[in-house]
Amino acid sequence: MKQFRINLLKVAITLSLLLICIPIFPQKHFSLKSPDEKLEVKIEVAQTITYSIAHQGDIVLNPSTIAMEIEGGKHFGINAKVTKEKRNKINQTITSPYYKKDKIEDTCNELVISFREGFHLVFRAYDDGVAYRFISSRKQDFIVKNEIAEFNVGATNRAYIPYVKTEQKSKTGQLFNSFENTYANTSVNQWEGERLAFLPLLVETTNNKKLVITEADLENYPGMFLENADKDATLKSFFAPYPKTMKQGGHNMLQELVTERKDYIAECRAKTLFPWRI
């Protein structure tokens, strides 16, 4: 009986130690609505960061993962710790001399989530759309190995897909293209193999509502392509790796052609503002 109690005590101690060693990631939930309150984006911060979008109760984007992989095995968005949040109401006029209108009204609600790992995540909710972007708060220059931008739009929803028009089969081979093609109209899970698509891309969602995926404020950073080689419900981002060597070529020798690439996508300054994902 005494030996049984000793063994039972050992088991209890072992289980206690195991429970202590298991990491616990408390979930944090955030919600942001458009000024007219018809659009709502929900953000969940746990082991990963996901967000979803609903319009008048209809889900137009299912929970989708976003993150950035930084050099040295670090991440923006993996096991991230929230330090604070800030909410703003934006109501301003933007002068636009190169657009069809000379002024644009910029009205939205904004949520800024700050993280211990050295970045902010900004969400904006407009009456007609949602956008997010990463902002670095790091004090030194750094390298971005990869960015994860997923769009869980539903496997059977139909999409208008602008595939890259090229004979190249590899992903890096498809990067050299004219960004011109007709749109293929097909269900998301009928995506054509390893083909990449450029932006914008449109998906028909619940109750005949449309979701357009694009980006903005793109500077010193690769443009986003989309792929769905798994033929499932989620479109995934793909970014051109950073050029390592180039040669002169193309039409009339007017272009620089990438002949070799590095194993990362961007070299960034401290406190970089990354492109908006819209």
Model-derived segments and spans:
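Bacterial Sec-dependent N-terminal signal peptides
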Residues: 1-29
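N-terminal accessory beta-strand-rich subdomains and adjacent acidic, glycine-rich linkers
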Residues: 29-278
